[in-house]
Amino acid sequence: MSHVELQPGFDFQQAGKEVLAIERECLAELDQYINQNFTLACEKMFWCKGKVVVMGMGKSGHIGRKMAATFASTGTPSFFVHPGEAAHGDLGMVTPQDVVIAISNSGESSEITALIPVLKRLHVPLICITGCPESSMARAADVHLCVKVAKEACPLGLAPTSSTTATLVMGDALAVALLKARGFTAEDFALSHPGGALGRKLLLRVNDIMHTGDEIPHVKKTASLRDALLEVTRKNLGMTVICDDNMMIEGIFTDGDLRRVFDMGVDVRRLSIADVMTPGGIRVRPGILAVEALNLMQSRHITSVMVADGDHLLGVLHMHDLLRAGVV
């Protein structure tokens, strides 16, 4: 395209709003296609013992990739196969236990129609999403989902706009309907998103990130305050636990306790840790969610907490551990 000058006073906002108005109207019309065929499609996907395989060419392929990703992350195992690659070997990934969703606005994608006889021989259930109920794909489908739109938002009527939006929304409708039917929970969602913020909050537990073994700062009750301070410094967690030979907790000493000792004006060289420790101390169980430990630490205004099974010391958790894990 040759260089053109911007028309004086061209209103980008108005052009954008016109697109939204057209696509909003098309989506409102889509409601009529959430019908018995939609139920049949959902049932085939719900009872599928394999995976939902999504296919599409061009812009429909881009929508198909997103659709497969949404299915997979909401409890319906799914993947995308490019129809061109399917015709050259990738169709081997499809089994009779799968369900295929084929997308084409015209319903006449030659790359997809060429695959239909093979899918039929494999007895793979076929759901076609098209904008043309009389198309080849619609007639060949076990279930046809219509996404016909009155017009594209593109003023030339050429660039897929309203039609791709309608297809995307139909995919979301399938995914969410199945999600609800399966009783899919936030915890289930987190399992497929372990790297996301929600996944970390719903999956990461204290025992995944706590300090254990030699990393635990601890001294005996008979230790001097000086020895306890050396342990605090060596382990760099701002505290030390006071425990016996069996790692049974007797108390805790933190950098906050040290400041209070200095405020008392006593000779710290003559003190034992038993003189200044806090008996007992706050502790959490190793199996609780890291975010629960975070909430406790924030409510108690502490930066570290003991991890224990009853009085038996198992580890120590510091606020920095939660920061590194992305929980905060």
Swiss-Prot record:
Catalytic activity, as annotated: D-arabinose 5-phosphate = D-ribulose 5-phosphate
Keyword Repeat among UniProt keywords: yes
GO BP: any one term: lipopolysaccharide biosynthetic process
Domain CBS: 210-268, 277-328
Binding site for substrate: 75-76, 82, 88, 114-123, 148-150, 222, 275
Oligomeric form and interacting partners: Homotetramer.
Name of the protein this chain belongs to: Arabinose 5-phosphate isomerase KdsD
Lineage of the organism: Bacteria, Pseudomonadati, Pseudomonadota, Gammaproteobacteria, Enterobacterales
Gene: kdsD
